[in-house]
């Protein structure tokens, strides 16, 4: 289907105009019907007149502007330079190009949610691949457009779903393809998620191997956010594997810790006998905002640590168990699997203390098949 035919139809219907009213003096009703349904390719003059009657701007200068913006946007997206892409699209008013076919490119490049399905017949393969990613159909996007970007998106989706073996395969493919294309940002992102996947499997040697490469890339790109993420995830893995003093050294050394970093610091202090420092970290965290996860859920996680610190007999208290299990269910249902995996030891501890051994086994078998036993 022709995009401009579609937009003429949509705008005419929105205004509640008849076909006869729109095309009067321009073309016949039957010809307009064919244009709207994509069965006819009208001349530039007829298109211009129909669009002008609908107050939709189009001329060669507008088309050139839109094409240049879209070309630059695709280059930035497919090489992982999302910050620059956001800046590029903020500078231009894409609605100005609504009557130009390239509007589809600009809309997809700036979209956070899928475009309406009725537009899909107007899309080319590249546009449709991005539409599928927005629809969370990443495997279909890879089939349509197998490149570093789509493999990265598939790997991230598999990672978030807890399918770590599949994630590793897709992310490694993304890294290799990005290396061939010189897409350094995609290489970095692939390495970060590869490290994350091995982190959640508590495979520290492979985690450190991927993070080591990721750290080099982040240093070369001067990406402080990526460096902090590597440090945070590595130290979190140390907590999961009982290396509390090493984790404490990292979390206590952060000059501007986030709420979740203070949560981890409090756990390190809890595990190493630094009770007062743990309580101070929790108090500080409770006053902070957070973008990473829902703040109410984050406060519940802080409350769990505080409860253990203030009630040494927490394993005998039903209200602790209720808070723990409810929070754990929210982590499983609302966030990437790594959050639940991190808190799994406390759930297993609770089940063991309350002699619910069957539930402990079922939890591991049903929800965490890749968790080392």
Language model features with spans:
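A short, Lys/Arg-rich alpha-helix, primarily the initiator
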Residues: 1-14
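Short alpha-helical DNA-recognition segment
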Residues: 15-34
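DNA major-groove recognition helix of helix-turn-helix/homeodomain DNA-binding modules
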Residues: 43-60
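Residue signature of alpha-solenoid helical repeat architecture, marking inter-repeat boundaries
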Residues: 63, 97-103, 108, 125, ...
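Amphipathic alpha-helical segments of tetratricopeptide repeats
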Residues: 90-95, 172-183, 212-222, 248-256, ...
């Amino acid at each position: 289907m022709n995009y401009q035919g579609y937009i003429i139809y949509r705008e005419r219907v929105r205004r509640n105009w008849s076909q006869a009213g729109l095309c009067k003096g321009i073309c016949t009703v039957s010809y307009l019907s064919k244009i709207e349904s994509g069965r006819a390719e009208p001349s530039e003059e007829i298109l211009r007149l129909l669009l002008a009657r609908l107050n939709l701007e189009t001329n060669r200068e507008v088309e050139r502007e839109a094409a240049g913006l879209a070309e630059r946007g695709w280059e930035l997206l497919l090489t992982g330079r999302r910050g620059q892409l956001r800046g590029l699209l903020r500078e231009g008013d894409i609605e100005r190009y609504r009557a130009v076919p390239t509007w589809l490119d600009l809309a997809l490049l700036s979209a956070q949610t899928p475009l309406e399905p009725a537009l899909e017949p107007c899309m080319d393969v590249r546009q449709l691949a991005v539409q599928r990613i927005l629809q969370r159909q990443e495997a279909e996007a890879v089939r349509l457009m197998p490149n570093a970007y789509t493999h990265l998106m598939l790997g991230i989706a598999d990672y978030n779903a807890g399918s770590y073996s599949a994630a590793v395969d897709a992310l490694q493919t993304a890294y290799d393809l990005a290396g061939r294309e010189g897409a350094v940002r995609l290489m970095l992102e692939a390495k970060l998620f590869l490290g994350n996947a091995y982190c959640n499997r508590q495979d520290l040697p492979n985690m450190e191997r991927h993070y080591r490469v990721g750290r080099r890339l982040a240093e070369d790109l001067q990406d402080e956010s990526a460096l902090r993420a590597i440090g945070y995830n590595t130290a979190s893995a140390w907590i999961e594997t009982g290396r509390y003093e090493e984790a404490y050294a990292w979390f206590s050394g952060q000059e501007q810790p986030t709420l979740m970093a203070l949560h981890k610091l409090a756990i390190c202090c809890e595990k190493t006998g630094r009770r007062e420092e743990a309580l101070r970290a929790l108090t500080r965290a409770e006053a902070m905002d957070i973008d990473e996860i829902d703040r109410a859920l984050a406060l519940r996680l802080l409350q769990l640590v505080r409860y253990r610190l203030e009630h040494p007999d927490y394993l005998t208290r039903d209200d602790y168990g209720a808070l723990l299990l409810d929070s754990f269910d929210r982590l499983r249902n609302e966030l990437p699997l790594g959050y639940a995996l991190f808190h799994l030891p406390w759930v297993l501890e609770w089940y063991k203390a309350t002699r619910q051994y069957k539930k402990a086994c079922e939890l591991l078998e049903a929800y965490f098949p890749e968790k080392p036993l």
